[in-house]
Structures are given as C-alpha cells and as structure tokens.
Amino acid sequence: MNNHIRPLYIPYAGPALLSTPLLNKGSAFSTTERKYFNLEGLLPEAIESIEEQTGRAYKQYQSFENDMDKHIYLRNIQDTNETLFYRLVQNHISEMMPIIYTPTVGAACENFSNIYRRGRGLFISYENKNRIDDLLNNAANQNVKVIVVTDGERILGLGDQGIGGMGIPIGKLALYTACGGISPAHTLPIVLDVGTNNPQRLADPMYMGWRHPRVTGNEYKDFVEEFIQAVQRRWPQALVQFEDFAQKNAMPLLERYKNRICCFNDDIQGTAAVTVGSLLAACKAAGSSLAQQRVTFLGAGSAGCGIAEAIIAQMVSEGISDAQARSQVYMVDRWGLLQEGMPNLLDFQQRLVQKAENTKEWVSEEPNYSLFDVMHNAKPTVLIGVSGAPGLFSKEVIQEMHKHCERPIVFPLSNPTSRVEATPNDIIRWTDGQALVATGSPFDPVTHNGQTYPIAQCNNSFIFPGIGLGVLAIKATRVSDEMLRESSRALSECSPLAINGSGALLPPLEEIHTVSKKIAFAVAKKAIEQGYALEITDEALMQKIEQYFWKPVYRRYKRTAF
C-alpha cells in the first residue's frame, strides 16, 4: 500500500465497493479498510499486495490456451478491478497488447454479442437521438476527459460489425491508460448504434444492437452533430477520438469538427503520425531524408490518403515544394494508380492523383497502371500497404522494387494479421535481408542467413497515448496538424535502428512510457506555441506531464458521509 499518497475519500461500502472496478482492491483491502467499509466476511482472510494479486492473475492468464479466452479473461479483470488489470498489463505489455488490442480485438468485435459479460461505456442508439444528454449523464465515469467513439462500420479490416465495434473504443482506451498514463476514471468508450448492413449480424439471434439498416445521409450527419453538441455541453474540454468510421464518413467528420472541438481521427491522423515517425527513423537508418523518397501506397482510402498527406507535409517541411512532394507519392487502389481524369474519386483522393505529365513515358500493357507497373516505372523507395487485402505485396512486386533500391522501406500495415499485404519473413527473404520493415500487426523476429531481424510494429499505440497525455496535461483546445507532426519527430528520435544502427525501427513496448512522455512534451510544446494552451516553462510542462501520469497503485481509502 502506498501510504505516502494522500487518501481517497469514497462513499461506497460493502458489496457496492467490491462491484466498483475503479475502486475495488479485492484481497488487498487492509484490515482497517475492511472494518470501516463493511467488507469483513466478504473477502478471504489473507491481505495481499498488488504484486501477489498480479502473480496469481498472470498464472491464471497463462492457463488459457487460445487468445480469445485470454482476451475474455483480461476483460473480466478490467471489469472487476481496474488497478489490478493495468498493473498486470503494464508488467507484461509486449505479451498482452496483442491480446487486449490488435489482432485479438478483431475477433472480439466479431463475437461481441456472444462473449458479452458486462456493459462498459455508452451505447447511444439512433432510437435515442433526442435523449443523448440523458444518456451521457448515465455514464459510470463523470469526470470524462477523453472519449473514443465509433459507429462500428469499418472495424479494422473486418468491415461493418455494428455495436460489436465497441471492442475498439474499449481496447483503445485501455492503451491510453496502459501506455499513456491517462487515468481510467477519465475515459469513456462510446458506440453510436446507427444500425448495421452486415447480414450476418442482422440474422444473428444473439446480436445485441439495433436491428436496422444503417442510417445514412443527412439523418446520420444530424445524429453525429447532436452527439458532438451533447458532448460539448457535458464535457466541453474532453478530447474526442473518432475511431473506425467508414471511409465515406471518416474524413468528412474530421474536416467538420477538427477546428470546432479538440478531436482527432486515429485511423487517419494517428496512423499517419506513427507511419511518418517510422519513416523518418528508416530514412535516417538508410542515410537519407524523407524528401528524397518516392513513396507508393497500396490502398487509397481515408487512412492511406491521410498518411500520404502527412508524408507530403513532412517533405515540404524538409524544403521541397508541395507540387514536387505530390509528384513523388503514388496512390494505387483496386483500379490501379490514381491519375488525372479518373472518375468517381473522392475529394481527398483527387488531391493525390498523379498528373499525366509525370507518367507520359511510363511503359505498361494496360492504361490503368498496376502496382507492379508503378514499381517498374516510378522506382519507389518506400512501399506502404493499407489495403486490407492479403498477399498483394508479391515476390514479383518486392523484387522489382529491390532492383532499383538497395534498401527498400516496406510497411505492410493492414490489420489484423490475416489481412497483411506480405509477411516480414517473405519481405526479408525476397530482399536478402536488405528491406527495412515495419508492420501493422505484431510479428516475431525473422532469421535469414544466420542474422535475426526484429520487426517493428508500426503501432498507433506509440503515438495516440502520448498525444492524449500532452493534450490533457495542459488542457489544449485543439489537436493541430503541427502537433501531430511533432509527435512523429519525437517518435523517430526513439528509434534504436536510427540511433544505434541496429535493432528495430521502433523501440520495444517496454519503453512505451518513456516514449509517450517524450511525445506528450513535444505535442504540448507545439500546442502552447500555437496558442492552444496557456504558456508555461519547459520545466513546468514536464512536471505537469509527470503529475498527470496515472500509475496502477492502490490508494488508501477513507469513508465520507453518505
């Protein structure tokens, strides 16, 4: 027990206290607390430390053979004793992050209604569109400072999961706490239940969501607007993170709200920031700059285009023109290279088309240039996959790239593992160990010709917890593009490969707290510089970040009057 930490005064006692995950200590309640909070007889006699509890919990965790059972077990601890949950996860972060988030969370979302045990967060149905204020007032946590919200339409690479998408905000906020030190008392996961177009969900008798085709058009837009206004009335300073919205809604929602409220979209901006940070590290390791690269994307959705725009902005910051930077970025989707004159492109895709003058001398058997055609003609040095289509980084494609680039940078970022464009093992073999690889899902190190290559996971968890920590520590009112660019720069400075010439592109997850604090500092400094937070000294800023950083330790309790 941490007696040096001031006590917490609480009104709960007896079974009600044991049923409150944020406050429950289980067998760690002291003799005095058991007496004054009417817990005597409700717990076994032994009084244990959190270390003893964690040891038991980890042993139980290891007894489960498959990842889904492990996920369910950890979620049960989270819904019973949050302090113990976060101590356990932090003690085994590399082992458990793939269980509480990608890739296991994908299966958890698909099976959400089947494995449902207990409600967490808020389910805001379109049927309650006129009562959103009332629903927000029902939240278990009332001092909310960060919200992760989804409508469940584009869950990872798995598509429309309806309310099953709630697994993503729950998992994301668990990482805000485990990686970024955001107190779980300040978090709120929300799913906007606007129906589902997934026939499997609608036909499933176990499905717990609103059984209705998805609301679209102005009705959908107005519903989201009412939600945002209600959040602003209830928690005007809360950071809102949009998560796993479909392509047709993700970018428009971000554009509509980014200058009105403190918000960001992790799929677009967080993925872009961690990718740019990883690219900066890879460029340093390869002895070049990002502005010198030619970048090809497979996947031209909102996430891919968001990453591309972030790369272009970084290139421009390194001294080249916007037009030159755009000429070095090639977007390929199912119809081939995005080019001038292509029909049915979305606004954010139009900004990334290749001009005819840039491809007039290209050689191809087809008018629509394939990924291989781009490899052959553009001779890119960077290849990024955000397609959600497995296996499209073929041996032919990778080896064509390697012909023109000694150290190709290859990032197959699609999640979950089953959707990855190519495995690190194949990429390393096809390039004889020369490729610099980062993936979206976790992969084991690759051994080739007697050398071991650690594979960096280009995981948004390296970025968004630090952004959240920086924003909340200084009460920033916006999340700007410049703040996100600072997060990328700070991440790149943590790269073992860039710093030491060996190791992975990104630091091990065991260093995530150090990384998050570094990113928080960089993001907060930029927010202050841009006028989005009150000015303070660097020393005071670092102190604020340290003070805000929540740690999973049990506090002493004293009882207040009811």
Swiss-Prot record:
Top-rank taxon: Bacteria
Binding, a divalent metal cation: 243-244, 267
Enzyme Commission identifier(s): 1.1.1.38
Cofactors required: Mg(2+); Mn(2+)
Site (Important for activity): 267
Annotated catalytic residues: 101, 172
Keyword terms: Metal-binding, NAD, Oxidoreductase
Biological process terms in GO annotation: malate metabolic process
Catalytically driven reaction(s): (S)-malate + NAD(+) = pyruvate + CO2 + NADH; oxaloacetate + H(+) = pyruvate + CO2
Cofactor stoichiometry and binding remark: Divalent metal cations. Prefers magnesium or manganese.
Pfam families: malic, Malic_M
Gene Ontology terms: cellular component: cytosol
Binding site for NAD(+): 154, 267, 415
Molecular-function GO term, any one: oxaloacetate decarboxylase activity
HAMAP family to which the protein is assigned, alphabetical: NAD_malic_enz
Subunit structure: Homotetramer.
Family per similarity comment: Belongs to the malic enzymes family.
Matches recorded under NCBIfam families: PRK13529.1 (NF010052)
Name of the protein this chain belongs to: NAD-dependent malic enzyme
Annotated organism of origin: Aliivibrio salmonicida (strain LFI1238) (Vibrio salmonicida (strain LFI1238))
